[in-house]
Amino acid sequence: MTPSETKLLSFLVSGELPAAAKAVLKRSIQEFVLQCGWWYQPIELPKQIALGTPQECHTNAIDLTLADETLIYCEGYALFKDSSQPRIHAWVTDGKGNAIDNTWPQPGVVYAGVPFTLDFVTVTTLKNHAAISLLDDFQNGFPLLGDLGDRPVEWLELRGRGTKKLM
């Protein structure tokens, strides 16, 4: 495991829900990613994919999946550089475990996340009238952190598995 992977994994493991939140939610975002997530291999942006709008990772990743059905929307945590802190981020994968990120000007150093079906991404985006984080969906009461997170048949895209499971 690389130092960046160790840093990200330590962050994920430390993400236990506060006591007050446990009355409402089953898991934290970090716990969800740990339970359902995969490691992804960062690659250079393919020539046919344009750089997206800075700080609009969810929109950029959704646009890529809508434009190319072979790409799968992923959301989780990533580190832009070894020295940066983990942040919620969205990217696409090619079904081979690669992280394709058209938001950052260069690939991040490590990606850990969950692949979602295009149907789930589209329905959630339409419901919210915006491309926001599926994991941090406060507008709808964090559904993936509650009962919906226990029903992966409704959201998990198996074609988008990464290089190896996080746990």
Predicted features by range, described:
Residues 1-167:
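A structural boundary/capping signal
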